Regions:
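Hydrophobic scaffolds flanking metal-cofactor catalytic centers in soluble metalloenzymes
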Residues: 1-136, 140-167, 171-182
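Tandem repeat scaffolds
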Residues: 173, 181-283
Length: 283
């Protein structure tokens, strides 16, 4: 574990924030829409099952999603919301056997995903020693958010998620400030910046504020992103080969999945190296 992080209970495993597709009713393959693009081979409306979804709720082309034009599927991460909706909110009753629940189940899924994403950030914030001054508030927010995920389908669809997200975000901002303040040197403030295609090879971005930055196709090879705040940063097709992301704040698996990289990149221990990343030194 990075020295900038410390253990905390509950952690992401306790909160069920890892996707368990075997316990889900293929909700991301049905509930969400997508359009034919570089990420998806076809158009699909919300609520319509993807033609690749099998009767057992498994993907029929899972091993070949990228070559078949469905790279967007390999990027998506529900933070465990799929199995929570399937097994907890709807008690293991699937939308095929109980079609009357389908619309409500599909409406609940994106709400649950947002709540689980917030839980991911809050759980991470609670592992950060520098954020101890706000740990009590963070834990209270985590407990409140977790309680919301246990609500009924009706309660979840009626939830004002933006208002709750705003409350949580204020705490995450404070957490970020506390952690990045401990990083020596002048920190770059690039929140929401347009850095699409930017040449940042080898850049010193330690403690940088890159919240919501557009880093699409940016060259970040060998960049030092330790303790940089990457919440909401768009890393699609960014090259993270050889970059140091240890201790990066609020980085998610979906962001890594959307980027390019290699075996030399250093990642937070809570995240996995995407299967499509290259071996070290392979160009």
């Amino acid at each position: 574990m990075s020295p900038d992080h410390e253990p905390s209970i509950p952690d992401t495993a306790d909160l069920g924030l890892r996707s368990d597709c075997g316990s889900c009713f293929g909700l991301c393959c049905v509930a969400l829409p997508f359009a034919a693009s570089a990420d998806f081979a076809i158009d699909k409306d919300a609520g319509r099952p993807c033609p690749n979804l099998q009767t057992d709720f498994r993907c029929g082309i899972h091993a070949d999603l990228r070559p078949r034009g469905f790279s967007g599927c390999t990027v998506f991460d529900c933070f465990g919301a799929g199995q929570k909706v399937s097994q907890v909110t709807f008690g293991g009753q699937d939308w095929r056997r109980a079609p009357g629940t389908a619309r409500q189940m599909f409406d609940v899924f994106p709400v649950m995903r947002q709540l689980h994403e917030l839980l991911w950030y809050l759980a991470e914030a609670l592992t950060l020693p520098a954020a101890r001054p706000v740990h009590a508030d963070l834990r209270a927010a985590l407990e409140k958010t977790e309680a919301l995920t246990r609500g009924s389908a009706q309660e979840l669809t009626a939830l004002e998620v933006p208002a709750h997200r705003g409350e949580v975000n204020a705490l995450l901002l404070r957490t970020s400030e506390l952690v990045r303040a401990a990083v020596p040197g002048r920190k770059k403030e690039r929140r929401g910046a347009d850095l699409m295609g930017a040449r940042l090879k080898g850049a010193d971005l330690r403690g940088a504020n890159l919240r919501g930055a557009y880093l699409i196709a940016a060259d970040l090879k060998g960049a030092d992103l330790r303790s940089a705040d990457l919440i909401g940063a768009d890393l699609r097709d960014a090259d993270l080969s050889g970059a140091d992301l240890t201790g990066a704040l609020f980085l998610t698996q979906a962001q890594l999945n959307a980027a390019r990289g290699d075996a030399a990149a250093k990642l937070p221990e809570t995240l996995s190296r995407p299967a499509h990343w290259r071996p070290a030194g392979d160009r």
